[in-house]
């Protein structure tokens, strides 16, 4: 994936202006409301908070290696449908829009969406 300097700067804006743990936890909550079948992977609220931390770690790793995001296999024992990564990315985009309000410009949204698609593709490739 080719990143322009502007796209990288826009992804950095999102990353630097948000409380990662809170945004991801809220996005997971939104995921469970909009796509209730995804909740089956979690035993309770503490599992959700723990998973939010894991998602933040994965996003941080991808952010730190934005030019070379590697495929990663999600926990085998959970048998997670890779499409759920895309659903979570969509919910994360909504949560970022809610959090950043007017700062979540179309350009910022496009750059973040490109980043989240790269991450989702890397996670999904871990299954093939």
Swiss-Prot record:
Keywords: Heme, Iron, Metal-binding, Oxygen transport, Transport
GO biological process, one term: hydrogen peroxide catabolic process
Binding annotation for heme b: 51, 74
Function description: Involved in oxygen transport from gills to the various peripheral tissues.
GO-annotated cellular components: blood microparticle; haptoglobin-hemoglobin complex; hemoglobin complex
Name of the molecule in the record: Hemoglobin subunit beta-1
Membrane-spanning parts: none
Globin domain: residues covered: 2-128
Pfam family name, one: Globin
UniProt note on tissues of expression: Red blood cells (at protein level).
Assembly notes: Hb 1 is a heterotetramer of two alpha and two beta-1 chains.
InterPro entries, per database record: Globin, Globin-like_sf, Globin/Proto, Hemoglobin_oxygen_transport
Family assignment from sequence similarity: Belongs to the globin family.
Sample GO molecular function, one term: heme binding
Superkingdom to which the source organism belongs: Eukaryota
Misc remark: This fish has three hemoglobins: Hb 1, Hb 2 and Hb 3. They all have a similar Bohr effect.
